């Protein structure tokens, strides 16, 4: 039974790599220019480890032991810790994003598959992919207290919180739904049917649209959430296994990984059209973009490698061997989201 649960998890990934809340609140986009490069973190879900990579030498400098099945990670609002969610050990590992030293482990957080802070920095939210609920925690700047556990649907996968910290959106991977939670009242506002196996999702800057990647299909669905009725306004064909999003950092484009097609599509958020494609082998999954916008880091899930793509030439420039089933990818030296 554990094998079956794990297999379902490997169909989900999020673009969880950095806190949009921290960026909005502090005005920062990672380490300061001129400082030593921050390490690059790659979560190895089947090794229960995090690979730490020196981006000046492209060597793995160490491998951090975490809890069971780390999938996603997220920066705290004060940027002092990056939190690794260990789904099968019900724990969170806090790591210094600059030194890669483990700071502490928080236990008793049930099945934290995906995680996110609200932009107002008051709430910390986790999706329990295996246990079919979403937990909402109060965040006091260093610790979390459970405020509400909300039963959702089958396999809540990824999370997105709007810029006003009023609505939490989540995909239901195995019931093919998009749901919205009212954060002030901590109740479900609505749910709509989606295409097959919705995974990652993201909102537009004006909070009017939600993009949903269909891992069981070959497209990104666009939902208009600005009015009283939620409508699917467009379907953007990207590639088989559309999975995770990463904003390019230019305020206009977003990337989506297509895990089965072994490609990454570039979407223009103004026209909602695909305007480019990158070839990335090995089942591209989670992504991060360097602060200068020149390179894309991609976890190649089935190849046990980190792939590095030159965004100017569109070419794969290197692959770095990491652990089993690499998933979340993140660095403090990231481009804006």
Predicted feature descriptions by range:
Residues 11, 15-17:
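Leucine-biased recognition of intrinsically disordered, low-complexity hydrophobic segments
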Residues 17, 21-337:
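Predominantly soluble domains enriched in secretory-pathway, periplasmic, or organellar proteins
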Residues 1-11:
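Bacterial N-terminal signal peptides that target proteins for export
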